[in-house]
């Protein structure tokens, strides 16, 4: 029989109702019924990345669509938690509201001591520190999720350390560290020491991420721009190779690659 979605619901209630119907043990969708928080995690991550892609391309039609998909993931996880009697979407929203109000006393509590952006950032970090301590954090680095993408986690670790004064003075000093890591990597490559090569390459990546931070550049955006640049240039080279019916060898590829700049 057909499952009817309740009428006269607001948009949020409607999407919750849809998810609950999909997960109905008797009349729901077999695929949706089988899902749990762990099986959905990869889809949640994918949707978040697709939101970022829509933002970077400036496509608001796509952004509207992708935000809806990401919202659906939030609802899904909340409904699954509700089934386990852990929390529901109202709890999620309430906690988010409380957190934002707590971190913005200059808006909601009329705290006149917070006036500038610097004051706001300082108080924001202060509140986050208190929140981490309340969760049992013993180090300023505690609470940086190990499930984050490696680049994102590296950046968060660096920012936390920097707030405690453990940081390079400027981008020039950071660049010196990058050069130092390049030299160390070169030495290990000459020795063909695979274990040390991996270690030094990791140090180089970490230092490059740090340099991006010190230059005030978003490292993910920097890498995505470089990816797009490579993709555009490669496709141009590819097109020229095919158009001129050139043999696909390294010499021709290098020549056309230089032309595609």
Where do the language-model regions lie?
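Flexible "arm" and connector segments at domain edges
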Residues: 3-66, 72-201, 205-261
């Amino acid at each position: 029989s057909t499952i009817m979605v309740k009428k006269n619901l607001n948009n949020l209630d409607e999407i919750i109702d849809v998810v609950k119907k999909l997960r109905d043990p008797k009349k729901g969708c077999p695929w949706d019924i089988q899902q749990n928080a762990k099986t959905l995690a990869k889809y949640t991550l994918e949707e978040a990345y697709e939101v970022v892609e829509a933002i970077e391309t400036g496509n608001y039609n796509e952004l509207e669509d992708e935000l809806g998909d990401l919202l659906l993931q939030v609802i899904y996880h909340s409904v699954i938690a509700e089934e386990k009697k852990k929390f529901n979407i109202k709890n999620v929203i309430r906690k988010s509201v409380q957190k934002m109000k707590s971190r913005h006393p200059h808006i909601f509590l009329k705290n006149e001591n917070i006036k500038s952006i610097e004051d706001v950032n300082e108080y924001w970090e202060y509140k986050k520190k208190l929140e981490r301590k309340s969760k049992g954090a013993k180090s300023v680095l505690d609470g940086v999720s190990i499930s984050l993408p490696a680049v994102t986690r590296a950046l968060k670790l660096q920012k936390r350390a920097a707030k405690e004064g453990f940081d390079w003075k400027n981008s020039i000093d950071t660049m010196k560290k990058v050069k130092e890591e390049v030299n160390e990597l070169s030495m290990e490559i000459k020795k063909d020491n695979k274990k040390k090569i991996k270690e030094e390459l990791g140090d180089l990546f970490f230092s490059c991420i740090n340099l991006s931070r010190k230059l005030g550049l978003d490292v993910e955006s920097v890498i995505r721009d470089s990816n797009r640049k490579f993709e555009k240039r490669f496709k141009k080279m590819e097109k020229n190779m095919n158009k001129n019916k050139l043999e696909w060898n390294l010499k021709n590829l290098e020549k056309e690659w230089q032309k595609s700049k």
